Amino acid sequence: RQMCIRDRFVFSIGNAGAQATSDSIVMNYLKEMGAPVTYNNEVKLLMTGHDKFVDLFENIRHARHHIHLEYFNFRNDSIANALFSLLAEKVKEGVEVRAMFDAFGNWSNNQPLKERHLKSIRAQGIEIVKFDPITFPWVNHAIHRDHRKIVVIDGKIGYTGGMNIADYYINGLPKIGKWHDMHIHLEGDAVRYLQGIFLTMWNRETGQHVGGPAYFPDTQQLPDSIAEEIAIVDRTPRETPRSISHAYAASIQAAQKSIRIVNPYFVPTKSIRKAIKNALKKGTEVEIMIPAVSDIAFTPDASFYIAHKLMKKGAKIYLFNGGFHHSKIMMVDSTFCTVGTANLNSRSLRYDYETNAFIFDPKITNELNAMFERDVQNSTLLTPEVWKKRSGWKKFVGWVGNLMT
């Protein structure tokens, strides 16, 4: 299994040299801390649920050897039913199919997979397991959940990002409206590391020993004109507990011109808040987009509380009004970006299993910037006047929520 960023966080741009760019600084930092940086990759952004599932299903249809899926949850709905039907067809063709989901994620889902569903899925030849099944006294299983979203097909194609398996990524939800999210399709050397993450978790949970060259095929060399540099930063609670937090903080510290963040549950840890404040002090433009509504009660209030603090320090805060923005992305200096599963809150950064791709490519970064600029048109800029209009109760709830996290 690959090593990612070590626990010890030592990062300074002071010695980086006057000519060093933010992307080169962060890339070197990730290398020094043990994150796998690969150079032979191609990335495609999947900006809607429709885009993700069309792309995913098409590539599953062409699978020849294996399909691996690791999700926080599979919601028992039309998308999951279509997916498992397709996977069952692939099993008949001789393709190995392994699927894993988080037991708590399933339990907290309003349409969970129940034992009868799992029995039916397994009867079709699909291997499917729960990560860390919930047993009495329950509370022992509340932390260290598997929040990753990873798919690997034939060891050649990989997916990660913010979307689980559910039809509301396409249809939205009555309470919050349209769902906005971000996923990526990867091909190239970085897929090997997604595969390593999946197989490590699978073998640990099942006691199996799946592995070998068939799961890590050689990748085709891409032309330099399209090859993209990617670091897969994986968080595991014991081995690399601060990996994603440090990668975010390092990226924010290294920024020289601009930082743009979109995150649905924005209650960042102190180290990330400090990095943002330091960036503002040195004149870096910081723009943060958070949803005005959420699928989790009280979350917007806690996010608004933190956002208001950062607004007073000079950050531009946008409240997205076009539904629920569940994307977990950051763009730095129009040169590199991250897309992944980690929320900027204590749950993701201190407890859960998470995976983010740091993509060192201006083209992909500016595609995300263009999306950000479109979404600004459907957002409200947080100002002192907007803040004053919030009720005292909402401000109090935000303060309590921030205190609890």
What are these model-predicted stretches?
Residues Q2, R6-T405:
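Charged, low-complexity intrinsically disordered terminal segments
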